[in-house]
Amino acid sequence: MTDRTAAATRETAETEIEVTLDLDGDGESTVDTGIGFFDHMLEAFAKHGLFDLTVRCDGDLDIDDHHTVEDIGIVLGECLADALGDKRGIVRYADRAVPLDEAVADVVVDVSGRPRFYFDGAFSQPYIGEFTSDMARHFAESLALNAGLTLHLSIEGENAHHEVEALFKALARSLDDATRVDDRRSDTPSTKGEL
């Protein structure tokens, strides 16, 4: 199997970001975004997706968390697309429902090369520490659009911490499933011959 790793950087007036990703890792992570709860979610994403992930971000948190969260989604999406290469042999489709106490998140993904994003639900509280709850949706959208994913997400619950954490874990599990190499397949999983 080819090496399915990638690294990317992004530097703007708002953020300076470095990300590395290994799709065939062990779930190890080193994350420093400046937002404690977001660090926790990215660590959970790596752990439950079995991705090795490093994220370092110096963002304009004196303003708010928007640019940091959005730009990390962009760079992680770029890394995901780069690590997948021509997508030869991948499973392509996956879905996962993950509960956390009263909350449940459903994720359906197609590693299609046709970026689309759909979200259903609302977070129960506007903030989790210094993290704006709705930025979880925005992170997933930025990831999907830059990785070339068709991504459908839905959440239900009563506690925003649980809702967001279930969402990150379901996203990780579904991406692990969809990006996994199927030994029975040597071609790209599309009748078109490419994704």
From Swiss-Prot:
Entry's Gene Ontology molecular function annotations: imidazoleglycerol-phosphate dehydratase activity
Transmembrane segments: none
Keyword Cytoplasm assigned: yes
Gene Ontology biological process terms from the UniProt entry: L-histidine biosynthetic process
Pathway assigned to this chain's UniProt record: Amino-acid biosynthesis; L-histidine biosynthesis; L-histidine from 5-phospho-alpha-D-ribose 1-diphosphate: step 6/9
Enzyme Commission number: 4.2.1.19
Top-level taxon of origin: Archaea
Locations listed in the record: Cytoplasm
First-listed, main subcellular location of the protein, grouped into a coarse class: cytoplasm
Keywords: Amino-acid biosynthesis, Cytoplasm, Histidine biosynthesis, Lyase
Reactions this protein catalyses: D-erythro-1-(imidazol-4-yl)glycerol 3-phosphate = 3-(imidazol-4-yl)-2-oxopropyl phosphate + H2O
Family: Belongs to the imidazoleglycerol-phosphate dehydratase family.
Name this protein carries in UniProt: Imidazoleglycerol-phosphate dehydratase
Gene name as annotated: hisB
